[in-house]
Amino acid sequence: MGNCHLLNSGDLAEVEKLLLELLNECKARQTECARLPGITDISMYNTYVHDTYRRIIIVIDELAEILDKKRFPKAQHARIDNIIGYLSIIACTGRAFGVHLILGTQRPDAAVVPGQIKDNISFKCCGRAENVLSQIILDDARASELIPADAQGLFVCNDPDKTVFRAYYLDNKQLR
């Protein structure tokens, strides 16, 4: 695998193919770690073996655009189920083997993000949100309580310290 793959497509077949490749990479790493006594994760593997694995970060913005079956014809629903399955397995086992998910969505309720995926996402952050949305994302109301309504770019984390941070702003000129 190369250093960076950019998939900017609503083509479910492309998304499914790439996620299957990444899932297979995760399984290969798991198999390699299991082959060595006492090696249970990528950090241990990289410490004791010279062939180090790089971490893989999967970033999906607007997850609902991929997983919402109402947006696609019935013929695509099996493909969406496959994508959900791949993401669920990666969410469950990927971190130990250096495959990480960063998922973005406007409203991560059960209709958009299945419980198996949501339950295995350990770090969550939320921008200013009303009480119900904050409950869905962070399991409490801190996004409605800690972030002023007029604040732009502020987020609160699900850590015990209730960390609030400001996202870095890039304008269009800086993105070129």
In which residue ranges do the predicted regions lie?
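P-loop NTPase catalytic phosphate-binding loop
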Residues: 1-39, 53-132, 136-139, 144-148, ...
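Short, low-complexity intrinsically disordered segments
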Residues: 42-43, 167
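Short amphipathic alpha-helices and their capping/turn segments at secondary-structure boundaries
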Residues: 43-54
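Conserved AAA+ ATPase small/helical "lid" subdomain
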Residues: 146-176
